[in-house]
């Protein structure tokens, strides 16, 4: 007992509290998903002393998910492991014959999610990106990066224009 409060090293984890900051915009990740990821890859954290929970490991587990932009983990004196998640915000969806993927405004590619489809511009046809449907990360080829940057510029222009945003929902790329 120290200064009117229980010493942190005596407090055990009693549960998980998950906050998805942008859940009204995107629904790629849920509380149940975060709990499942942690149970599978971290192991049992309930009952552990809160000071012994590896918060960096918790964040790495959550951040490794393709639709997660960033997470923050912390514990509180009431024994809760708190995880705050910010999801990636896609601006365009690429649909190829072997599947598809999203790109965010920075050009980060990530797979389509089975649980949720974001309402963004769709581009199909002859897409000159070698990324397959399960790929996550940035484009490394300079020609592919230049093409992707042009596409993102067009999509941003359409999003900023009330006329184009309401009239175009899909773009087909021809050779």
Write out the residue ranges for each language-model feature:
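Charged, solvent-exposed interaction patches on well-folded alpha/beta domains
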Residues: 1-22, 27-33, 40-49, 53-175
